[in-house]
Curated annotation (Swiss-Prot):
Protein family according to the UniProt entry: Belongs to the UPF0225 family.
Lineage of origin: Bacteria, Pseudomonadati, Pseudomonadota, Betaproteobacteria, Burkholderiales
InterPro entries: NTF2-like_dom_sf (IPR032710), UPF0225 (IPR023006), YchJ-like_M (IPR048469)
Protein name: UPF0225 protein Pnap_0466
Pfam family for this entry, one: YchJ_M-like
Record SUPFAM superfamilies: NTF2-like
HAMAP family: UPF0225
């Protein structure tokens, strides 16, 4: 059995169109986190960054954070369990700028929380980077 991607992206099952199957990690965010290929757009980068949070991959998160806003280091909340990602919208502003609005659900210290953010992304040298975001 293959491991489903943490981002939760699904693919319609051709045998049963009403049912969706989670994409396996190796066919979804895996190639981005393994640096085989760069994320092709801001939407894919957003999903891969969520997967990196689930997998506690600070190296990938820092590498995909724009240098102008990148922190020196990342700390993960101990015991935090990411529960799901809902991408609400992906808006291309121009060839090198985009926004992605999402809600990420998490359980921390037994308490459910959600992060609702509109993130800004920029493309430089054919690579997309997270810049910052507005939380709701």
């Amino acid at each position: 059995m293959t491991t489903p991607c943490p981002c939760g992206r699904t693919s319609a099952n051709s045998a049963k169109p009403a049912k969706t199957q989670p994409l396996p990690f190796f066919a979804c965010c895996g190639p981005y986190l393994n640096e085989s290929v760069p994320a092709p757009d801001a939407h894919a980068l957003m999903r891969s960054r969520y997967s990196a949070f689930v997998l506690q991959r600070a190296d990938y998160l820092l590498a995909t954070w724009h240098a102008s806003t990148r922190p020196a280091a990342l700390d993960f909340a101990p015991g935090a369990k990411w529960l799901g990602l809902d991408v609400r919208s992906h808006r291309v502003l121009d060839a090198d700028h985009a926004e992605v609005e999402f809600v990420a659900r998490c359980r921390e210290a037994g308490r459910a929380t959600r992060l609702h953010e509109r993130s800004r992304f920029v493309r430089e040298s054919e690579r997309w980077f997270y810049v910052d975001g507005d939380q709701f």
